[in-house]
Amino acid sequence: LIARRWERLYNRLPDGFVVETPLYAGGHLGVTKMEQVENEEFSLEKVVPEVVEYVEKELKTPTPVIAAGGIWTREDIEHAFDLGASGVQMGTRFACTYEGDASDRFKQAYIDATEEDVVIIQSPAGLPGRALRSPFIDKYLREGTVGNKPCIANCLTHCRYRTERKTFCIAQALIDAFFGNWEEGLFFCGTNVTRITKKEYVADIIAELFGPQENK
């Protein structure tokens, strides 16, 4: 529907389709209901081939399909390619690189995370999201709202914080997390956050995934 609407109104088709599985991804999970988060119908194995087929048969374009959610190893990448994806999106894998611009406290929160620290919340947009259980999120899960700051961005079409002052300002909470405010931040993460044990250089991760790269 989105692709056809853009084609009709703007004579443009997407440059690519990112297919994200809620089973493992971080942040907003691409589904609308909490019970859909663990539904295997939204696995990469199910959805990627369907989207690839749609692009080939309906759009008739070489538009790339990019798999996201839970991609960590070279084997994960190759599996995504076997499903028909043209590329992968890796977020959590690179979150604790030295080159990443998040604060050291943000990165340490990832490094310290355990499986019990990873929770599913309903965001101010009314959508499921995966995040670390920070003091901020603990209070939100207990009380349903932690809103005591102004709406700073008017960034969402649907936002309970802007309209009702319930839940919280997601823009402010993400900024707080980025700058390392553990007490008041929303630390979105994927399930693979528990596999992070240290900060790394991007080059070392690339070498692990694809082999050492020669300087050119």
Could you say what each language-model-derived stretch is?
Residues 1-7, 71:
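Active-site glycine- and acidic-residue-rich loops that bind
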Residues 18:
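Glycine/serine-rich phosphate-binding loop and adjoining beta1-alpha1 elements at the start
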